[in-house]
Amino acid sequence: MSEIGSYHDTIFALSSGRLPSGVAVIRISGPKTRFVYETICQAIPEPRHAALLTFRSRNGDAIDRGLTLFFPAPHSFTGEDCAEFHLHGGKAVVEKMLAVLGELPGCRIAEAGEFTRRAFANGKMDLTIAEGLADLIAAETEGQRRLAMQVASGNQRKLYSEWRQRLINARAFIEAELDFADESDVPGSVSMQVWQQLSALKHEIEHHIASGKRAAMLRDGLHVVIVGAPNAGKSSLLNFLAGRDVAIISEEAGTTRDLLEVKLDLGGIPVYVTDTAGLRETDSVVEKIGIERARARMAEADLVLSLEDMSGPVSVTVEKIEAETWLIGTKADLGGSASGLWKYHISTMTGSGLEQLLDALQAFAEAKIGQIEDAVPTRQRHINLLRATIEEIEKAIEGDDLPLELRAENMRLASQFLGRITGDVDVEEILDVIFSQFCIGK
C-alpha cells in the first residue's frame, strides 16, 4: 500500500455494497474526522449515538439528509476518530458526498484494506484476525463463514501467543542456567525438562499443521472432475448439478472442447465441479488441447467421476490418477446389463439416481473436510512460519553437542517465527500483500 505511513491523512470510502441501493454507508477515519463533521454537518453528534442530520457541501448546498454515527478514538474500529454517514443509496448522492469529502484539506479516498491496516497498526487486531475478516467478507458458504469467524474471533492469536510464551519461558530457564549456574537458588540443571517441554510443543504444532490441510480445503474448495468418452452424458450431469444450462448438450461427439466449471454449496462446503472434453483419440488440434487440459485437471482433482454410457458396449477404462474415482453409469433409462460395474447409475432424462449421487458427493465432501478445530492455520503463510518454528525447535532439542547459547538462539528464532504470524514481530514486508485482499472501505 503506497504511503501507508501517512496516518496524518483522514481517509474515507464507500463501505457498503454496489449502487444504487436503499442505503449507502460512507466510512471516515483519521484526525480530521471532527473537522469533517463541523464542515458537513455543522455539529458533532454524541458519540456512538445515531443522529439525523443534513449533510452539506462547503458552500452550504444540501447533499442529503440521513443518519450519522461518531466513534471517538480509541474506541473505534481503527482506533482513530471514526464516523459513518448513512445516505440514500443513489449514485449521484454518493458521488457528490465523496467529491465533497475529497475537497476537504487532509482528506483522501482510502486504499484497499486501509481501514483494517490502521486497526492493526493501532493494536485493535493482529494479522490473523485481519486475515479472518478478509475471509469472512469473501465467504460464500456456511462452512467458510464458520471457519473465517473462528479466525476473526482471535482463536489463532490466543494459541500462537500461548506457544510463543512457552518458548520464551523455556529460553529463560536455559539463560538462567547459563547466567546463574553457580547460584544456589537456581536448580542444578533444567535442560532436560526444557527439552521435554519443547518436544511436546513440537508435536502440538505438527498436529496443528495437519488440521490446516482440511481448513485449506474448506477455504479454497474441493475439486470434482467429470470425465468420460464423448457423449457419455458429462455435460448433462454438469447442468443438473448447476441447476441451469451451463454446457451445450448435443448428439454430436466432441461438443465440449474446453473446461467448464460450476461452484456448488454442499452442506456449507464449496465444491467446484468441472466438465471436460471427451477422452478419445482425435485428429482435431483443438480437441486434443481440450483433452490435455482435462487430464491436467484430473491430476489436481479430489474426486473424479468417470462416466460411461450404460446402454452401449461396456468398455470401462479408468486412467491412473491419485484421486479417488467413482464409476458412473449414465443413460440408465435406456437399459444396460453391466450394472454391477457402476458405483451409481443415473439418468438425466428421468432423474433416476441423481439425488443419490448428489447426496454421495455431499457425504464425500463432509468426510474430506472432517471436524475443523477451533484454531487452525488458514493461510500458506501460517503453515510456512509454523514449519520454520518446528525446524528451530528441532535444532534446539537435537543440538546435544552445541553450546546452550546456540540452542537458546534457536528458541529465540522459533518464538520470532510465531510472532510473525500474528504480526508481533517484523512483518512490514508482507503487510501490503495481506491488506490488499480487502475491498476499499474495509
Swiss-Prot record:
Instruction: Relay the cofactor remark from the entry.
Output: Binds 1 potassium ion per subunit.
Q: Which Pfam families match?
A: MMR_HSR1, MnmE_helical, TrmE_N
**Positions of the TrmE-type G domain:** 221-366
Any idea where this protein resides? Cytoplasm
- PANTHER family for this protein: TRNA MODIFICATION GTPASE GTPBP3, TRNA MODIFICATION GTPASE GTPBP3, MITOCHONDRIAL
> What does the subunit section of this Swiss-Prot or TrEMBL entry state?
Homodimer. Heterotetramer of two MnmE and two MnmG subunits.
Q: What does this protein do?
A: Exhibits a very high intrinsic GTPase hydrolysis rate. Involved in the addition of a carboxymethylaminomethyl (cmnm) group at the wobble position (U34) of certain tRNAs, forming tRNA-cmnm(5)s(2)U34.
Its name, as the record gives it, is: tRNA modification GTPase MnmE
Which species is this record about?
Answer: Brucella melitensis biotype 1 (strain ATCC 23456 / CCUG 17765 / NCTC 10094 / 16M)
From which lineage does this chain's organism come? Bacteria, Pseudomonadati, Pseudomonadota, Alphaproteobacteria, Hyphomicrobiales
